């Protein structure tokens, strides 16, 4: 039986965290190629360090897109807000090592006269949803993201102009009878101008934390930590080197659900690491939104070049109102889980990925242009009818 009384912790990182800078650049490159060709192939990795950005990977798409990669990378860094001596969007040294996608990989993915499009690689992908928050996301991660988004908005608006782009948060929540009831600790480390006193930073952060957490949830003063080292002036890639794909738990469920191990950013939607994880979240969210379970975990698995999932696993953690085997069958009837079926159902061959690079790929509002389509709950009626 699952524990019902416990403390669970999740963390988030801001758009200016060095790894998130790299995720943003890599996804900006994906969007660039998909803008030129909706069926372009991209696997883009980014390294960022003091005044240097290096991009490497494999692509298949028009040369015109390749010629624009540096411009797109600089604009991504500018949008995040880096204009510091150690990392400035106009001044960093840029190196690009993108080359053509392997023909051996392409032949497994491409459709032919005798086969559908296959998966871009083997792997396992998980999706999860729960009823702890309106976004149907685990509460510790939801509030960790929300704190940093609130601070980022204040920085970009000028309300807290002395904040820097780099920041981290961590929220620990007390659960009673399986439901979150209050925060036991909150940690926020945020980059700042050298002239700002730590007490001013603490009070500004406190206001944003109080705005984000439900009433009465604030942790005790002695477990509210803001810049616990006492100083955070040097940050971003100047403070720590960043790499694409190193924040996969922040990107997903904050440790509250399993992870298949594959990162999302820098990958076009033929890569099932990304598209199948989005599909699994979409299905799990619709199950919970339909009231068929309070929690739902879905695992999908694929083989490179194979055009259908090898397995579909569902676990409602004892909260389900329906038979899980029947639920699995119904979900497979409602959504084609082939790599192409996922892309077509969620309309993933569009430049919608740079916006996913910070504050989570899940628990976001669907956008009018098709962004975050995997957050829609348009299967709810069909699921209810099926049961």
UniProtKB/Swiss-Prot annotation:
The entry's keywords: ATP-binding, Cytoplasm, Magnesium, Metal-binding, Nucleotide-binding, One-carbon metabolism, Potassium, Transferase
Positions annotated to bind ATP: 17, 166-168, 231-232, 240, 246-247, 263, 267
Reactions listed under catalytic activity: L-methionine + ATP + H2O = S-adenosyl-L-methionine + phosphate + diphosphate
Pfam families in alphabetical order: S-AdoMet_synt_C, S-AdoMet_synt_M, S-AdoMet_synt_N
Alphabetical list of Gene3D superfamilies matching this protein: 3.30.300.10
Main location (coarse class): cytoplasm
EC number, as in UniProt: 2.5.1.6
Biological or metabolic pathway of the protein: Amino-acid biosynthesis; S-adenosyl-L-methionine biosynthesis; S-adenosyl-L-methionine from L-methionine: step 1/1
Names of required cofactors: Mg(2+); K(+)
Subcellular localization, as worded in the UniProt entry: Cytoplasm
GO biological process: one-carbon metabolic process; S-adenosylmethionine biosynthetic process
GO MF annotations, alphabetized: ATP binding; magnesium ion binding; methionine adenosyltransferase activity
Binding residue positions for L-methionine: 58, 101, 240, 271
Ranges where the record places region Flexible loop: 101-111
Binding site for K(+): 45
Task performed by this protein: Catalyzes the formation of S-adenosylmethionine (AdoMet) from methionine and ATP. The overall synthetic reaction is composed of two sequential steps, AdoMet formation and the subsequent tripolyphosphate hydrolysis which occurs prior to release of AdoMet from the enzyme.
Family assignment from sequence similarity: Belongs to the AdoMet synthase family.
Oligomer status and interactors: Homotetramer; dimer of dimers.
Record-given protein name: S-adenosylmethionine synthase
Species, as recorded: Rhodospirillum centenum (strain ATCC 51521 / SW)
Gene (UniProt): metK
């Amino acid at each position: 039986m699952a524990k019902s009384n416990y403390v669970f912790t999740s963390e988030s990182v801001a758009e200016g965290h060095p790894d998130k800078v790299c995720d943003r650049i890599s996804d900006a490159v994906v969007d660039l190629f998909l803008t030129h060709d909706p069926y372009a192939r991209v696997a883009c990795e980014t390294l960022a360090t003091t005044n240097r950005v290096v991009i490497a990977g494999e692509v298949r798409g028009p040369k015109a897109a390749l010629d624009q990669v540096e411009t797109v990378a600089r604009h991504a860094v500018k949008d995040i807000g880096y204009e510091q001596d150690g990392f400035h969007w106009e001044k960093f040294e840029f190196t690009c090592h993108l080359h053509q996608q392997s023909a051996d990989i392409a032949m497994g993915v491409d459709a032919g006269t005798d086969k559908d499009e296959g998966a871009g690689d083997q792997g396992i992908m998980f999706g999860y949803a729960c009823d702890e928050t309106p976004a149907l996301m685990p509460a510790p991660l939801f509030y960790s993201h929300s704190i940093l988004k609130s601070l980022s908005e204040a920085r970009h608006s000028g309300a807290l102009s002395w904040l820097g782009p780099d920041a981290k948060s961590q929220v620990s929540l007390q659960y009673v009878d399986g439901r979150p009831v209050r925060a036991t600790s909150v940690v926020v480390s945020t980059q700042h101008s050298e002239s700002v006193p730590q007490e001013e930073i603490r009070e500004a952060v406190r206001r944003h934390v109080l705005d984000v957490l439900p009433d009465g949830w604030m942790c005790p003063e002695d477990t509210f930590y803001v810049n616990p080292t006492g100083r955070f002036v040097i940050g971003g890639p100047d403070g720590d080197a960043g790499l694409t794909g190193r924040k996969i738990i922040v990107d997903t469920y904050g440790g509250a659900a399993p992870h298949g191990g594959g990162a999302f950013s820098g990958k076009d939607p033929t890569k099932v690491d990304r598209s199948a994880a989005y599909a699994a979240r979409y299905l799990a969210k619709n199950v919970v939104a339909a009231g068929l379970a309070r929690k739902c975990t879905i695992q999908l698995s694929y083989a490179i070049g194979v055009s259908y999932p090898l397995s579909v696993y569902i676990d409602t953690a004892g909260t389900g109102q329906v038979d899980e085997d029947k639920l699995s069958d119904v979900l497979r009837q409602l959504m084609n889980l082939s790599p192409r079926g996922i892309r077509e159902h969620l309309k993933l061959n569009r430049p919608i990925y740079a916006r996913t690079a910070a504050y989570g790929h899940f628990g976001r509002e669907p956008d009018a242009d098709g962004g975050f389509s995997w957050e829609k709950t348009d299967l709810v009626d069909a699921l209810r009818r099926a049961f």
